[in-house]
């Protein structure tokens, strides 16, 4: 009888209130800690703010905020006044001061050690020490919050299929006004697959890329066993084969390395490289081949200079050199193109030697998610005088052999890529991948777009119209999400209004840039103990790094030294649509190469 009375009382008692931290009351990176079931406390330690919700700035913080320009103002200054920047670029001292500020201001947004992960919304030793997790910039939304975004918005998020079809799917190809080309698009995909290696068997919050940065595991393999299978063990070189007088990767049969190929791909076209998914498209295999050639070329240079070195030292030093080349190309060619700055970004690790800087990195799940730049893809790929749709291009290394690297480089440098921001520019062939990106973001319980904007010191949007810069999509988004503070991160990045004549909107840049620069400059080779000629084979190896560029990489390894850049050189191409709209390729809906990719190991 007493037990029944107890149960009755329990059923009549009011339920516990929602977790008080669900409303994200603590501002300016203050840490919310619940007290009991209905109260909270904000820890404002070292935020520069105080008060119940860490919303009142200290004196020095107030001064800094008054003097600090908005991100859009900084972007405007750096992308205009070309004559002034040409002068600045020629004054080393002044250029170094600005470059140091760019690096530190961005990198300090990502302070090590890592903080949260998909399972821990609070600091824990597991979140710090377990390298198999992606870290997180913001903790996941708590399970006991009333809505998926905390307290704002509806209790259920809209169907991801509806989001993709209404706001993301391409109606007509929109070229990137910055002139980004397919040489850039495939470089981005190839480069990032060394650290974006989601372990889908364990879930989207886990990674197989335990190096968490630029380690060139996509060239050499993630494990020592894979690396050994790819090595020649002579003069430091990697295995290769010669076809029609040119060097290409060895085959799976010759190396016994696991690669992902469908059964119909013949043995002689099953090339084996460091990253198991690079057989997906010839654009990835193009860069895999270029870096294979570069490694063996550097080995020859070091062998000539250091004849007494054995195979192991030649291999290890060459790998360090290629890591350095990669970082330099990414900063000075890749990031500079994306930024659109007239200021010349420079790779010089010594600029940070007198700064407080930690040479370590942990890849964040949000960084992985925001890098899903599928709008870059055109509806067809043009190589020389031939046009290939997705069905013809995927898992078809014969195209690489047919055209050769020279034609690939020339053609991809000429073909413009799509604009990423602005919405409605994702090709039909990868729409399922877009759904997967949204669904996995929900599985990892990302906080809202505005919470991420606040985390990276960007003013939150006040309305959907402010987000999109127009009325149609804004109205439809409001009907689905109800509140701008409930807008999801990933779809928002793709529908956000682009900056003027730019590929991205504000949020993509302000979140992505800190992750990128911290990952690049936090590499061990950039540290004072590593950054010495003696660790790279002397002055000869050091010079290879310090003179590297995308053009020199191609010239040193591709016959004829074709002109190469990350943007098309004809300005008219950035103003006109050059590729057919997706409606003419609606039959591609049934092919989904990126889902094949996801099922095995990684993301496009």
Curated annotation (Swiss-Prot):
InterPro entries, alphabetized: EGF-like_dom (IPR000742), Haem_peroxidase_animal (IPR019791), Haem_peroxidase_sf (IPR010255), Haem_peroxidase_sf_animal (IPR037120), Oxylipin_biosynth_metab (IPR050783)
Disulfide bonds, paired cysteine numbers: 21-32, 22-145, 26-42, 44-54, 555-561
CDD domains from the UniProt entry: EGF_CA, prostaglandin_endoperoxide_synthase
Listed GO MF terms: heme binding; metal ion binding; oxidoreductase activity, acting on single donors with incorporation of molecular oxygen, incorporation of two atoms of oxygen; peroxidase activity; prostaglandin-endoperoxide synthase activity
Biological role: Dual cyclooxygenase and peroxidase in the biosynthesis pathway of prostanoids, a class of C20 oxylipins mainly derived from arachidonate ((5Z,8Z,11Z,14Z)-eicosatetraenoate, AA, C20:4(n-6)), with a particular role in the inflammatory response. The cyclooxygenase activity oxygenates AA to the hydroperoxy endoperoxide prostaglandin G2 (PGG2), and the peroxidase activity reduces PGG2 to the hydroxy endoperoxide prostaglandin H2 (PGH2), the precursor of all 2-series prostaglandins and thromboxanes.
Chain positions of site Aspirin-acetylated serine: 516
Protein residues bound to substrate: 106, 341
PROSITE patterns: EGF_3, PEROXIDASE_3
Further comment found in the protein's record: The conversion of arachidonate to prostaglandin H2 is a 2 step reaction: a cyclooxygenase (COX) reaction which converts arachidonate to prostaglandin G2 (PGG2) and a peroxidase reaction in which PGG2 is reduced to prostaglandin H2 (PGH2). The cyclooxygenase reaction occurs in a hydrophobic channel in the core of the enzyme. The peroxidase reaction occurs at a heme-containing active site located near the protein surface. The nonsteroidal anti-inflammatory drugs (NSAIDs) binding site corresponds to the cyclooxygenase active site. Conversion of arachidonate to prostaglandin H2 is mediated by 2 different isozymes: the constitutive PTGS1 and the inducible PTGS2. PTGS1 is expressed constitutively and generally produces prostanoids acutely in response to hormonal stimuli to fine-tune physiological processes requiring instantaneous, continuous regulation (e.g. hemostasis). PTGS2 is inducible and typically produces prostanoids that mediate responses to physiological stresses such as infection and inflammation.
A GO cellular component annotation in the UniProt record: nuclear inner membrane
Active-site residue numbers: 193 (proton acceptor), 371 (for cyclooxygenase activity)
Protein name as annotated: Prostaglandin G/H synthase 2
Species this chain originates from: Neovison vison
